[in-house]
A protein has these predicted regions:
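An acidic, gly/pro-interrupted, aromatic-rich
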Residues: 1-95, 143-174
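C-terminal structured "cap/appendage" subdomains that terminate the fold
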Residues: 86-157
């Protein structure tokens, strides 16, 4: 898409992803071609760069769900938060409660905690039976990781955080 809609020559010929510190800059420093904005931004109702918009329309579409489930940015954010939570000496319930506070800005209900604890145990079982899957899952993204003691636990907690990121409340209201 980038190549077809661009002039097809020079440095704008192809999109080149940044790395290291440049990869984690604020969105306002993202290079955007006026004729071809990043598709993810379009899916989440970012205003076009060729006109000024006073209000922004808010939609909720299947493509947004697809992006939230598969985009390396979201998965990497889930991994980094899960890694931070693992360093804390709290119970699984405490880690889930903290992730709700950090992502949604509210405390999780006892029912939500019970559902997530159950899901966490299923993910522990799944990744415990498939350590290769756990390693592939936590390898998404470029953010450096320290030595990981328990890859299965990190992958399971990453799934919990990723699930919270994918709640409608997280996507459209925060």
């Amino acid at each position: 898409m980038w190549k077809v809609a661009s002039s097809g020559r020079g440095i704008l010929k192809t999109y080149v992803q940044d790395h290291d510190e440049d990869l984690y800059r604020r969105g306002m420093y993202t290079f955007i071609k006026r004729t071809v904005p990043p598709p993810t931004m379009l899916m989440f109702d970012a205003s076009p760069r060729d006109i000024c918009e006073v209000t922004r329309h808010s939609t909720n579409t299947p493509l947004q769900a697809l992006i939230m489930l598969n985009d390396p940015t979201v998965l990497e954010a889930a991994r980094v938060l899960a890694d931070q939570l693992l360093k804390e000496q709290t119970s699984t319930e405490g880690k889930i409660q903290k992730s709700y506070r950090l992502i949604l800005g509210r405390r999780a209900s006892s029912e939500e905690i019970a559902i997530m604890v159950n899901y966490h145990s299923k993910q522990l079982e799944y990744f415990g039976n498939s350590s290769e899957q756990a390693e592939q899952f936590i390898a998404i993204g470029e953010y450096p990781m320290e030595e990981i003691k328990d890859k299965v636990e990190l992958a399971a907690l990453m799934q919990i955080v990723h699930t919270i990121y994918n709640l409608e409340e997280a996507i459209t209201k925060t």
